[in-house]
């Protein structure tokens, strides 16, 4: 099964490369701007034949992507293997304005006693007193993204292919 998936990925890369790729720095800037313009993603996790996709608000702190959550079934996949896929997208209004970002990477649970956790909570505007009064633990999860696929119909007018790929790992 793993060999079949690996073969399909190789075929996809060989036969479907971006036609007119953007320079890497310009693509990174475009991805950053897209993420800054949105605040909700669909996060998919899984293990074995079980998968879960959850809509979540996200925030960015020091260029990193985080979610805050009280828990739920998404943690089954996060604890099992950490592998995630996430998507951020605009409402569909036609091919010319089609815009979405698919991301693949790893979910990293942030220790609630760490400085990183405090930074994320503060960036979200949550006070320590509020955390103590909550009925459930507020978990912070960092999404370490290694692969981005941006689909943006507006790129065609700039001379680039609508589909752009940024591989960081």
PLM region spans:
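Short, charge-patterned binding micro-sites
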Residues: 94-96
